[in-house]
Design a protein with these regions (language model features):
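Hydrophobic, aromatic-lined core segments that form the binding pocket/scaffold
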Residues: 2-175
Length: 175
């Protein structure tokens, strides 16, 4: 199963979990993970726009983000980079998802992972054949530029909660 498919399942499952948590239903057992409808959305520009609005330390990274956003308008993602992106998202699970237990906000954490995947996967696709060192540099760069600021995390979470563009269905449509 591709990483994109796994992320779709994570979104759908965690949306159901989030709804149960919000309704204070704590008996979360044996829910299927493959129930979702994929409607084509295709346009990921709002994800790139959100990233451009963050507190970014490096102008070079912002230029790369602009180029990747332009590339994403006319291209689709493949599964060529699933292995390194899976490793990066494993880091996100350990860093963010497991701490979501305290905040009772699991869906924003998954949306953060999906957005990180979309931005970094398109950047890797844009570079066509990056070396392993370049792949690592891109993933580390995303982490450094986005995660360095508490305000960035707050802005991302607010968008994930209140902006309908970041709905689960919309993100599944992009994946």
């Amino acid at each position: 199963m591709s990483l994109s498919e796994r992320l779709c399942r994570l979104l759908a499952f965690n949306e159901r979990v989030q709804n149960m948590l919000d309704d204070e239903i704590f008996d979360i057992t044996a829910m299927p993970t493959d129930e979702y409808k994929k409607q084509s959305c295709g346009d990921a520009s709002f994800i790139f726009d959100l990233h451009k609005s963050l507190d970014i330390m490096s102008k070079d990274w912002l230029c790369e983000l602009e180029a990747t956003a332009d590339f994403a308008k006319n291209n689709t993602l493949s599964n060529r980079f699933d292995k390194p992106l899976t490793a990066y998202l494993d880091y996100c699970v350990r860093r963010y998802y497991l701490s979501a237990i305290d905040s009772f906000n699991v869906i924003s954490t998954i949306k953060r992972m999906v957005c990180a995947y979309i931005v970094t996967a398109y950047e890797l696709e844009r570079l066509e054949n990056p070396t392993q060192a370049k792949v690592v540099k891109i993933l580390q760069g995303y982490s450094k530029e986005v995660e360095h600021s508490y305000e960035n995390g707050e802005l991302l979470e607010d968008e994930f909660i209140f902006n309908p563009l970041f709905s689960t269905d919309n993100l599944i449509g992009i994946l």
